[in-house]
Amino acid sequence: MAKSIKDHLQDALSNIGADNLRRFQSRLGDRKQEPRVRKSTIEKLKDEIDLVDLLVNTFTSDAVSVTVDILRGIKCNAVAEELLENTGQGGVSQPEPPVPEPIPKDPAQLKELKVTPCSQQFKNKILREKGQETYEIKDKSVRKRLALLINNVDFDDKAMKRSGSEKDEENMEKLLKELDYQVVKRPNLSAKEMDEAIRDFAQREEHKYSDSAFVVIMSHGKRDAIMGVHYHRTNNPSDSFPVDNVYRRLNSENCPALRDKPKVILIQACRGGEHGRVWASDGEPDEPIEIEDDDFVHKEKDFISLMSCTPDTKSYRHVQNGTFYVQTLVDVFIKCAHEDHIEELFRKVLRRFEHPNMIGNFKQMACKDRATLPKLFYLFPGL
């Protein structure tokens, strides 16, 4: 027997999880268009069945389109599209994309959040529709994913200390673990030690049993190099690590275990200028927030990189909460990795940097670099 509209609505709402269901009900109560639903009515609902009855009785033939709009509003896009497909309403026009969100006002929120898990239903749908266009993801029970995390905080030149980057390290490590990567941490390295760390990482046996890898480097930098902890502009300018060496160490020749597997490179550093700044939020004019800048860097198949800023520009860091780049990237991955492939996740990060209130009067734009992924890389968190 064919399913009714109520059945499809109940399937969709049962598939979004308890947290998203609460967000759905909150959005429904906040809806301004007529007919409106009283919040007191929503508070009396016992389960998804009651919610579906309310949707159908209130919106009648528009119940599906209203549900889809709210699902998209809470970023359950995959469930929304599946509902449209299952109800034969795939021609419903999509709303205008929302204004990109700024980074969380309280970056400590990131510590509380977990990556939204991917549903098996969504994964099956992607593999069914785009299987030949996606990278193979190994079964969680047998794979051994690795991520390398290099964070230079303390430099010989005390003035170069990257205050706040400990928070970046904490947030990035949490994200990578949530995505099922074992994190190899190497703090405070010279240029030579960075090269050795990436070389050793490339030789790890676990890559044979992995489907992908992440390399995250956070430091000061220049346009095409990352600074080691012994760097000094006049006394030791040679302690800098060419970004090209990241790609050379991980290419198909030097790291055959990762051949034809996606390798994601994330670099937080500046690409020009070295002076700290002070920025005051419009909302807190009496409490200036100290902002510093990091200097930055850059090359194969199956690589994709997201740099914290474009060439010849600065990358800003809050001296307590960490960089805007890492805060934004982690927030996007937490909320969207369950339904977006890696390039779409990066695009959403870039959209956030367009937001006029991102970091006040300072301008910074993250930069996708050396993207050589011939296929779509879905992380399918939780699966």
Swiss-Prot record:
Residues 8-81 form the Pyrin domain. The keyword Ubl conjugation does not apply. Its main location: other. Residues 1-142, 275-296 form a propeptide. One of its GO terms (biological process) is positive regulation of interleukin-1 beta production. Thiol protease which cleaves IL-1 beta (il1b), releasing the mature cytokine which is involved in a variety of inflammatory processes, and mediates apoptosis. Component of the NLRP1 inflammasome, which plays a crucial role in innate immunity and inflammation. In response to pathogens and other damage-associated signals, recruited to the NLRP1 inflammasome in its precursor form. Its subsequent activation causes the cleavage of pro-il1b into the midformed il1b, which then evetually leads to il1b maturation and secretion in the extracellular milieu. This is Caspase a. The gene is caspa.
